[in-house]
């Protein structure tokens, strides 16, 4: 029986070439997967940095938002408190003005205290208060501070939800060293591929050895110096190898297909990572664009509103101070008016006291003068004829009673009724 050694050599060469091609194809998948995995491992630290930095940026934005809310609430609370106080002070000043209008000046009985104040200044203040409060209300409504705050909060909520989704996906991908690698699908697939690759190397080595043995066998069979029994043993070995070739080829192909399938699965997972990484980078750009454009505009709007409202509130505070001052001055005017009445009444009573005292003094003096006159007459009657004229100056002997003149010019004061005086006393309490 002829030994088909030449056919075995040809088949061995063909099988080796096919096995090499199968291994090369599988190796291409392994190399491509390894390269893509290497790129992923290089991106993981950057990804972790991105996520940490993004979380910090969002926390900073939330702090800015909360600060704006506090600032805006503070301005709005100040505005509400100041507006309430202004309205109270306006009402008080109106009441004081009504008092001025209802207080008739007793000195002429026609004019009121209101006619002695600067009406234009008061009206200008009232108009200023009213207009400034309207301006503040228009400013707040026109710029829709609530809407601005809602938009800012909505934007931050949207960004926060996106980042939370990205962070959750990151945890699901199990990329951190501290996480268990035993349940990492890529690690499991790569472990399987390593075992299959080891088997394929062994199979490819067997194909290569078989080819070498076939070539050597062909030479041995042609060599007459080799004993026949050795040739028969060699043929038996080669025959067994030839019979095992199809199964080895099937195992090699099967392993290669499994490796390709596993690599495709790994690539799919890596593609998911690449897509995720791209989403994170897109989010970074989105957050950066938001900060440089939309947030900048929103912050400027808040700043403009805050600045303008604060300026208007300063004006309102000035108005409030002026209202208090006007009210204080006008109330003091009323008190001073009634104090004037009491002062005039006091002076009138002083005049009366002085007049009464002078009348009493005149009566006393009159009695003294009258008694003095009687004494003089009595003296002259008894002694006048016996005193020489040159004993003392005759004018002394014959002088008359001293004359005393008392004049009192009363202070001209307007007449004030007792009812008005009583009212003045009541108003001073």
Swiss-Prot record:
UniProt cross-references to Pfam families, sorted A to Z: ATG17_like
Cellular localization per UniProt: Cytoplasm; Preautophagosomal structure membrane
Species classification: Eukaryota, Fungi, Dikarya, Ascomycota, Saccharomycotina
The protein's name in its UniProt record: Autophagy-related protein 17
Gene: ATG17
Entry similarity comment: Belongs to the ATG17 family.
Keyword tRNA-binding applies: no
Ranges in coiled-coil conformation: 146-175
Mode of membrane association: Peripheral membrane protein
GO BP terms in the entry: autophagosome assembly; autophagy of mitochondrion; piecemeal microautophagy of the nucleus
Molecular function per GO: molecular adaptor activity; protein kinase activator activity
Keyword annotations of the record: Autophagy, Coiled coil, Cytoplasm, Membrane
GO cellular component: Atg1/ULK1 kinase complex; phagophore assembly site membrane
Subcellular location, principal: cytoplasm
Role description: Autophagy-specific protein that functions in response to autophagy-inducing signals as a scaffold to recruit other ATG proteins to organize pre-autophagosomal structure (PAS) formation. Modulates the timing and magnitude of the autophagy response, such as the size of the sequestering vesicles. Plays particularly a role in pexophagy and nucleophagy.
């Amino acid at each position: 029986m002829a030994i088909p050694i030449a056919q075995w050599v040809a088949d061995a060469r063909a099988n080796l070439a096919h096995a090499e091609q199968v291994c090369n194809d599988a190796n291409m998948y392994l190399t491509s997967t390894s390269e893509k995995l290497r790129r992923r491992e290089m991106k993981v630290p950057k990804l972790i940095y991105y996520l940490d930095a993004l979380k910090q940026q969002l926390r900073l934005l939330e702090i800015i938002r909360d600060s704006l809310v506090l600032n805006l609430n503070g301005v709005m609370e100040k505005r509400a408190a100041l507006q309430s106080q202004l309205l109270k002070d306006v009402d008080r000043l109106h009441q004081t003005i009504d008092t001025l209008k209802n207080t008739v000046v007793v000195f002429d009985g026609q004019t009121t205290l209101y006619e002695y104040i600067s009406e234009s200044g008061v009206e200008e203040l009232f108009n200023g208060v009213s207009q400034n409060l309207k301006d503040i209300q228009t400013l707040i409504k026109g710029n829709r501070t609530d809407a601005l705050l809602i938009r800012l909060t909505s934007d931050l909520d949207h960004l926060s939800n996106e980042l939370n989704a990205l962070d959750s996906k990151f945890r699901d991908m199990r990329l951190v060293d501290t996480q268990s690698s035993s349940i990492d699908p890529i690690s499991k697939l790569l472990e399987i591929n390593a075992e299959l690759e080891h088997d394929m190397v062994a199979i490819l080595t067997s194909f290569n050895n078989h080819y070498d043995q076939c070539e050597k066998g062909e030479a041995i069979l042609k060599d007459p110096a080799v004993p026949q029994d050795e040739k028969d043993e060699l043929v038996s070995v080669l025959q067994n190898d030839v019979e095992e070739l199809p199964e080895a080829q099937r195992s090699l192909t099967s392993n290669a297909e499994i490796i390709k399938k596993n690599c495709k699965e790994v690539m799919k997972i890596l593609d998911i990572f690449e897509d995720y990484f791209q989403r994170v980078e897109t989010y970074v750009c989105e957050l950066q664009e938001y900060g440089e454009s939309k947030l900048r505009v929103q912050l400027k709007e808040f700043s403009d509103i805050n600045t303008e409202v604060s300026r208007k509130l300063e004006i309102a505070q000035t108005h409030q101070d002026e209202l208090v001052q006007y009210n204080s001055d006008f109330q003091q005017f009323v008190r001073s008016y009634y104090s004037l009445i009491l002062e005039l009444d006091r002076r009138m009573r002083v005049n009366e006291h002085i007049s009464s005292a002078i009348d009493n003094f005149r009566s006393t003096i009159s009695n003294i003068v009258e008694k003095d006159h009687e004494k003089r007459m009595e003296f002259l009657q008894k002694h006048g004829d016996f005193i020489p004229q040159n004993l003392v100056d005759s004018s002394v002997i014959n002088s008359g009673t001293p004359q005393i003149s008392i004049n009192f010019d009363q202070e001209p004061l307007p007449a004030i009724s007792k009812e008005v005086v009583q009212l003045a006393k009541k108003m001073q309490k």
